[in-house]
């Protein structure tokens, strides 16, 4: 999957002209994703006045190693590195959507309310699912924004929302979120990537957290130790299964 090529195709679709002009004018932003054990997901890249527009991308490792404080990225970095444990080289990041806007209500109010907006959402989510499945293939996903939960299929039993359509097994509730495991894909014609017949992520852990920022209490933040323990759990199970005869 060539992420840049696919996004260029999406932004050149005829329906783009029917969406708010800022979608086309600002362009899109994406990470140069690679295979990693941990994947952190956000919602969509923000846009601040004066920032460059167009097709912007780069490796997430640059952000992981940045020392300068950032209201968004600094709390994320603290989940990965504490001086004793360093998960930065094992972690990738993506936003599930690629349009640039600061207002978290923009998608609901301006995109999903537009008949053509649904296709825009589906096309982006289809790309995102392929990146997760085919490129990153993580052992642990941290879904770091409650707004994103629905798009993974988390609320299917409660609301009937399918979108990417993962099936989850609840493992346990923790102060920093709900830990689940991927068990397969929903059998639904509404899945946004019907060409994906089986997931490569069976057994992968998913930690559903709230949106984490500088104001989030320490107890509600995943720590490097917690993430390392979950990874160790996954890897120990792999070792035990390899002994099966």
Regions found by a protein language model. Give the residues of each.
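Proline-aspartate-enriched helix->loop->beta-strand connector
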Residues: 126-148
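A short acidic (Asp/Glu
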Residues: 50-52, 103-106, 145, 149-156, ...
């Amino acid at each position: 999957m060539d992420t840049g090529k696919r996004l260029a195709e999406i932004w050149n679709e005829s329906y783009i002209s029917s969406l708010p002009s800022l979608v086309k004018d600002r362009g899109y932003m994406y990470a140069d994703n690679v295979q990693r054990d941990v994947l952190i997901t956000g919602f969509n890249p923000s846009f601040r006045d004066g920032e460059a527009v167009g097709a912007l991308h780069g490796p997430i490792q640059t952000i992981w190693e940045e020392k300068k404080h950032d209201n968004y990225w600094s709390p994320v970095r603290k989940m990965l590195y504490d001086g004793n444990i360093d998960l930065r080289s094992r972690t990738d990041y993506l936003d599930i959507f690629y349009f640039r806007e600061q207002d978290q209500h923009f998608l609901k109010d301006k995109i999903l309310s537009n008949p053509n907006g649904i296709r825009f959402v589906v096309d982006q989510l289809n790309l995102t699912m392929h990146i997760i499945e085919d490129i990153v293939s993580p052992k642990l996903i941290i879904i770091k924004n409650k707004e994103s939960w629905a798009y993974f299929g988390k609320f299917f039993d409660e609301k009937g929302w399918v979108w990417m359509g993962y099936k989850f097994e609840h493992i346990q509730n923790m102060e920093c979120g709900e830990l689940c495991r991927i068990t397969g894909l929903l059998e639904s014609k509404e899945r946004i990537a019907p060409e994906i017949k089986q997931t490569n992520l069976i057994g992968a852990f998913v930690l559903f957290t709230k949106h984490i920022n500088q104001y989030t209490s320490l107890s509600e933040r995943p720590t490097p130790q917690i993430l390392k323990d979950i990874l160790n759990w996954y890897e120990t199970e792999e070792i035990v299964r390899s002994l099966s005869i």
